[in-house]
Amino acid sequence: MLLGLCALIFVGACVLGFVKIDPQTGKPSLSLSGAGIDVSLPDLGNVSLPDFGGLAIPSGAEGLQDAAQKAISGLSGWPYAVGQSGLTVKTLRAGKGEAVLVCADGYTMLLGGGSGMGAALTAQLLLSGVGHLNAVVAMGSDADSIGGLPLAMTLMQPEYLLYPSSQTKGTAYNRLMDTAQKSSKTQLMAAKPGISFMLGRAQVTIIGPAKTPHVDERNDGLSVRIDYGQTSVLVLGGIIASGERELITSKVNLDADALVCAQGGSEEATCQELVEAVSPRIALLTGKNPANAVRVRLMRVGSDVYCRADFGVMTLFSDGQTMTAKP
């Protein structure tokens, strides 16, 4: 609740121009004069501040603004920083679901939207310096997978929306499609395995589902492979173990440097066969409570495992030669 309220305030501040985003670092900066808004500030120069035990507090509006800016710029290891070159893959806080921001040489794509109405998701995109999305991929059709996408799409105006075929078109799915259809800037594309496109110098390929339909609709969700230079990452979305085995049987290339595990790292996915097929050096578990058995399976093949529960927002970066993780 508190995160959502803060996100709404932040989104509003960005829209009104009180918060500026540095496109190079993604760090926010505070401006007390909004875009097109005259903000009259009282004269604080003669105000006597109480003694805070030697703590230097600047007086005047400019001093307060400088202090606020220094506090923001002093944040170490800013988790939302996105490079303007290379490949950045960032897992965002997305409630019960998953949202992955992909930036390649200045081009942007969002995989999934997580649960909720999208205020927190949109705030994180703005914190990452993203004001526009080139593509959005709806990884599933349920509310936990795409709930936050309509608001993000309304503000970010993506050029493409790739969506899975769905047997059951629920409220979240219908709201997403309605939002996309109302936008004159967004082209809808039914995603099928084998579809491939370039995002900057990154090649994005839809590798799953290997077949449809399924008794368990989670296996109808999309899985994505991203190749950048000599490096690669798999984002498997919301499929479960049976869907992973179908990917293996389909003979699609699953070998990758990094793996964003399906189902956030729950026991229902990341089966032993998949772990052996991918053999990732890096594995990200985005669920709130990933299964210990999944961690063990990954560590046994030599993976460095990072969990949302421990690190929050997690980032992969590639220069085309090496993939590294920055939790």
Positions of the model-derived regions?
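Non-globular, low-confidence helical/coil segments that flank catalytic cores
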Residues: G4-G45, L49-P327
